[in-house]
Design a protein with these regions (language model features):
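Conserved N-terminal catalytic core of the sugar/cofactor nucleotidyltransferase
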Residues: 2-44, 48-129
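Conserved alpha/beta core of the MobA/IspD/sugar-nucleotide pyrophosphorylase nucleotidyltransferase superfamily
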Residues: 6-10, 14, 188-281
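A structural signal for short hydrophobic beta-strand segments in well-ordered beta-sheet cores
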Residues: 49, 177-179, 251
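Phosphate- and divalent-cation-binding pockets in alpha/beta enzyme and binding domains
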Residues: 84-85, 139, 237, 269
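Short, conserved catalytic or adaptor-binding loops enriched in Gly and charged residues
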Residues: 91-97, 178-179, 241-243
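Short, surface-exposed amphipathic charged segments that create phosphate/polyanion-binding patches used
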Residues: 114-121, 165-173, 265-269
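The conserved acidic donor/metal-binding loop of glycosyltransferases
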Residues: 132-135
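Conserved core of the sugar-phosphate nucleotidyltransferase
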Residues: 137-215, 219, 224
């Protein structure tokens, strides 16, 4: 069943999760040389505002890719104290292709809790959901936008290993999407054991938290309980939507990499990969 009201609606909205605490970004790393501005922002842990190619914040590139995919309304889910994020996009930057709203996630209670904070922004519309610390290829965002219903972008593991900036040991532990015979998501396997991975068909398709949702996801977010680590996880909400609400998530399989901004070691590699990309907000 396709989410109500989402069968033929064009997607113009995206929710960007920007509430992260940045614990690993704050951690000093003597092997990484940062400039003064990068060091200043890294100490605060605001990954999205780390200056990269051309001195522009990483989030500028994430938002520009959404605009390239014809998204024109974005909601940043932020912490109450993230005034710098709100100030940049409300006052410091001229927005030509995007309008940007904000939703406050009062406490860091997980990705489903963050998505729920944006319910007023979403209303009855379908929407994309992405992380603020990942740069997704425009092809993935466009493919999700063009679906007729809910969906997930999954990324080929071998391509991620060869072309992403993410360390191989991290990629090998990433969640894997299981796809049924109809081309829809059946389940997300979080941190699957090697013996389990060995039984799965190749190639492996990784979930990088890049979704198209219908408003039905908010009901799923309300129904789930906390995970073992005490957070409300969007993957749990998706599984509930599949199992109990009969939502179908079409799988969009992408053979391009995702870049990840987690620690200071990621800054130089991302800056090199984003050099030459034009940002237009």
């Amino acid at each position: 069943m396709v989410g109500e009201g989402d069968q033929h609606m064009a997607v113009g909205k995206a929710v960007v999760l920007a509430r992260g605490l940045g614990t690993r970004m704050r951690k000093a790393d003597a092997s990484v040389v940062l400039n003064e501005e990068q060091e200043k922002v890294a100490q605060k842990g605001i990954k999205a505002l780390i200056p990269v190619a051309g001195g522009r914040p990483f989030l500028d590139y994430v938002l520009s890719a959404l605009a390239d995919a014809e998204i024109d309304k974005v909601c940043l889910v932020v912490a109450p104290e993230h005034e710098e994020l709100r100030s940049r996009y409300s006052r410091e930057v001229r927005l030509e292709r995007l309008s940007i709203s904000y939703a406050i996630q009062e406490r860091p209670l997980g990705t489903a809790n963050a998505v729920a904070a944006a319910e007023e922004f979403v209303g009855t519309d379908p929407f994309l959901m992405v992380n603020s610390d990942n740069y997704y290829p425009c092809e993935a965002l466009t493919a999700l936008r063009e679906l007729t219903g809910a969906g997930v972008a999954l990324f080929e593991q071998n391509v991620m290993l060869a072309e992403s900036n993410i360390a191989a040991e991290r990629i090998l532990s990433f969640a894997v999407g299981l796809i049924n015979g109809e081309g829809c998501l059946e389940r997300i396997l979080e941190k699957p054991a090697q013996d389990v991975l060995a039984t799965l068909p190749r190639p492996l398709w990784l979930s990088m938290n890049c979704w198209r949702f219908s408003p039905m996801i908010f009901e799923a977010c309300r129904r789930i309980g906390p995970s073992p680590r005490g957070e409300y996880e969007i993957t749990d909400a998706v599984q509930l939507a599949i199992d109990q609400l009969h939502e179908r998530f079409q799988a969009v399989c992408i053979a391009k990499p995702v870049y990840d901004m987690t620690s200071r070691a990621d800054i130089p590699s991302i800056a090199a990969r984003l050099a030459g990309i034009q940002v237009r907000l």
